[in-house]
Amino acid sequence: MNCAASVSVIMPAAGSGQRFGSQSNKLFAHLDGKPLWQHAIDRFQHRGDVRQIVLAVSEEDESRFREQIAAISSAVPIHLVRGGATRSESVGAALEQVKRFAAESAAANASTQTLVAIHDAARPLVRQSDLDRVIAKAAETGAAILAAPVSGTLKRATGDGSETVDRRNTYVALTPQVFAIDVICQAYARDRGRMATDDAQLVERTSHPVQLVTGSADNLKITFPEDLRIAEAILNECRSEFV
């Protein structure tokens, strides 16, 4: 899998602000003067290999997203689709848009390889060097994800207390998770409705190997208010990395 790649980016954005302590979607919270979702889009929209970005949003947030998207200048088309009750349902809905785009692209250029990059819209600080490497690995193998080595000591709760877990070869999954379109579509068709912790797990169930690409720990997911303060500090310290 080493022909020219065309990347479609899917961003599930239909979540709530419950854990963030907000009455509205946390993705509308501002980081350095812009909503979180826009930072996530900015990491992708100026890349030469990205062809479209698909946001899966809730019905209640759709009009607000449309207003904010209309107010920005985007280098690639940004599509909105109605998300589902779960992350998997939202990604599945976005895949339908991606499949239509891929069919049109294949008709125009049969040599183009379509990749799908699934990225948490609440991860505003993914580095371009990490994107380069995970996209290249997915183009080569069909499935690759960013992941960070576990650095702290892991404990497993037991009936008698706890035990230490060997952290060697243990990673925390990040996003984006990047797949050849046929690989991720097969995974979703096979496991429609089944729970999974992430998209890579669905692909693993098809017996297709998923490659790990070591990514920066700066690529944190904004879940709690304190995460936003950490992201602000990272952005101020390493601004040139996130242009």
Swiss-Prot record:
Molecular functions (GO terms): 2-C-methyl-D-erythritol 4-phosphate cytidylyltransferase activity
Matches recorded under SUPFAM superfamilies: Nucleotide-diphospho-sugar transferases
Q: What is its EC number?
A: 2.7.7.60
**Site description Transition state stabilizer, residues in chain:** 19, 26
The alphabetized UniProt keywords are: Isoprene biosynthesis, Nucleotidyltransferase, Transferase
The biological process GO terms on file are: isopentenyl diphosphate biosynthetic process, methylerythritol 4-phosphate pathway
Q: What does this protein do?
A: Catalyzes the formation of 4-diphosphocytidyl-2-C-methyl-D-erythritol from CTP and 2-C-methyl-D-erythritol 4-phosphate (MEP).
Protein family: Belongs to the IspD/TarI cytidylyltransferase family. IspD subfamily.
> What name goes with this protein?
2-C-methyl-D-erythritol 4-phosphate cytidylyltransferase
The pathway to which it is assigned is: Isoprenoid biosynthesis; isopentenyl diphosphate biosynthesis via DXP pathway; isopentenyl diphosphate from 1-deoxy-D-xylulose 5-phosphate: step 2/6
- Quote the InterPro entries the UniProt record gives: IspD, IspD/TarI, IspD/TarI_cytidylyltransf_bact, Nucleotide-diphossugar_trans
Site feature Positions MEP for the nucleophilic attack, where: 167, 221
> Which Pfam family, just one, is annotated for this protein?
IspD
Catalytic reaction(s) noted? 2-C-methyl-D-erythritol 4-phosphate + CTP + H(+) = 4-CDP-2-C-methyl-D-erythritol + diphosphate
Q: What class of enzyme is it?
A: transferase
